[in-house]
Amino acid sequence: MEEFKVYFEKDGSRQQYFLYPLLFQEYIYALAHNHVLNGLIFYESSENFVYDNKFSLIIVKRLITQMYQQNSLSNLVNDSNRNRLVRQNKNFYYQTILEGFSVIMEIPFSIIFLSSVEEKKEKIPKIQNLRSIHATFPFLEDKLSHLNHVSDILIPYPIHLEILVQVLQGWIQDVPSLHLLRFFLHEFHNWNSLIIPKKSISFLFSKGNQRLFLFLYNSYVFECESALVFLRKQSFYLRSTSXGXFVERTHFYGKXEHIVVVRRKNFQKALSLFKDPFIHYIRYKGKSILASKGTHFLMKKWKYHLLNFWQCRFYFWSQPHRIHINQLSNRSFYFMGYLSSVRINFSTVRSQMLESSFLMDTPTKKFDTIVPIIPLIGSLVKAKFCNVSGHPVSKPVWADLSDADIIDRFGRICRNLSHYHSGSSKKQSLYRVKYILRLSCARTLARKHKSTVRAFFKRLGSEFLEEFFTDKEQVLSLIFPSLRSPSHRVHKGERIWYLDIIRINDLVNNS
């Protein structure tokens, strides 16, 4: 990374990044393929290109040249055999260049991000704990109980391919790199379509190219979120203490001022509608939450301006169904695998004034999270652990594994679900899911041994599956010895958030 910093400092500009020359550097491909510099790189053979001991700049230049040449040949030559050979070679060429190109596009943002993290480490102790997904829920517990409304937002998708390039153009003004990116998108998608078709997205966003997909998607989502930050910053004289530093880009403020409603001549007047000091924004993947203490009218204004911003910036037609405004005390919202709501509890207090006494109900708001059973059952159906009615079925794909491996796989899924859903106030839904997985494991073992579940339990007993129901308090007592005392016991219904979870379980993620 220090070598990259020196390279960009030579230019003298934070935005005029010349990334294209890095495409011909050896260490880029070493990073892309997780190889050391003296490991497996390129060599040219008579039939195709594979990896070997030496890297050649001529090879990369030739790959790029042949990509452009074969693109024109495929339009001129009608020979089916030649076109089939061209397509086979193109897949290899694109895959080779894409892996290095993905790393190159991330370099300037990685430098700024790492420097920002280093600065925050000095201000925020234990900042690494904020990487945990569970770190979001203590924040919601602390903030949402004081708010009134929440907007459930789905970020617009799909998007026109040229918009993805224009989003990056605001950050990086290296024309050759952007032209190469546009060429990749043109080749792997139907350029005549206004949206990204699902069938043509399969190769570019395949498992081998997820890095480039995540980079493009995150840059697009960042552009969507910038509208919120811009409007909030312009509506306050004091900067919000909870807003993080964003990457500097060009032309954004000029574009944002041309939103249909927020025009330049009446900018301050329009932004006066957004003066709400209690507003919070959280996003995970394509879904975000915008919560406010303001009125329903204020939330409708936010919705209206977001819809106009999407239409003017990304050329989306009005999509009001992507933003739902709910009152926290009446509706719950699904976010990050939990069904969350703000519950109002009334406590009766006896008050006495002089000789008279009376009872008074005092309402208190409490943030509540439960495990939604229907999405989890749907995920179990997709994974073929049960049928649509919730009845456990065997897993034939795992029947060829050893008994220990089968039990370990089912047990790992149960432990991960219990670990992630430890913040639920009600565990009945989680117990049902664990019961389905336990019986599915038994059916899989019985299928393997060509026996029945009852005979299998009778012969071996049910103790071999007890790890599925390991008590949470026993696990915590091993981690925190102080919890062994009666005064520090974990009470029933008490929520526990872990700061070591950096990804959602696949079953939760698919729900």
UniProtKB/Swiss-Prot annotation:
Usually encoded in the trnK tRNA gene intron. Probably assists in splicing its own and other chloroplast group II introns. It is found in: Plastid, Chloroplast. This is Maturase K. PANTHER family: MATURASE K. The keyword Chloroplast applies. It comes from Acorus gramineus (Dwarf sweet flag). GO terms for molecular function: RNA binding. GO terms for cellular component: chloroplast. The keyword Phosphoprotein does not apply. The lineage of its organism: Eukaryota, Viridiplantae, Streptophyta, Embryophyta, Tracheophyta. Belongs to the intron maturase 2 family. MatK subfamily. Keywords: Chloroplast, mRNA processing, Plastid, RNA-binding, tRNA processing. The gene is matK. GO terms for biological process: mRNA processing; RNA splicing; tRNA processing.
